[in-house]
Amino acid sequence: MDAGHTALAMGEMAQAAEHYREATRLDPNLADAWQSLGMALVKLEQLEEAIATLQKLVQLKPRDQLAYSSLSLALGRAGKIKEAEEAAAKAKVAGWGGDPTKLQA
């Protein structure tokens, strides 16, 4: 993770993504690595991979506001507006301390 953060700070987005990708391989349950990878992929405009990555994050942290907000951003950038709105609604519910997994579309 530290190598990814260093690359990110130096503006090396692709290199940062590779470091975060490696962190997810080493520890598939490391939510911070999935979050960082997902957002790096959004910045690289690799939106389909970003969406899949952030969906994994949501699986790991199903009540996390930032996870749903990040997923909403990626979906919106990919033009998947309905799905982005659903993820944004779940982010709001999570922010209020509710259970976004029970929100019906």
Task: Report each predicted region and the residues it spans.
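Structural signature of tandem alpha-helical TPR/SEL1-like repeats
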Residues: A9-E22, L44-K56, A78-K90, G95
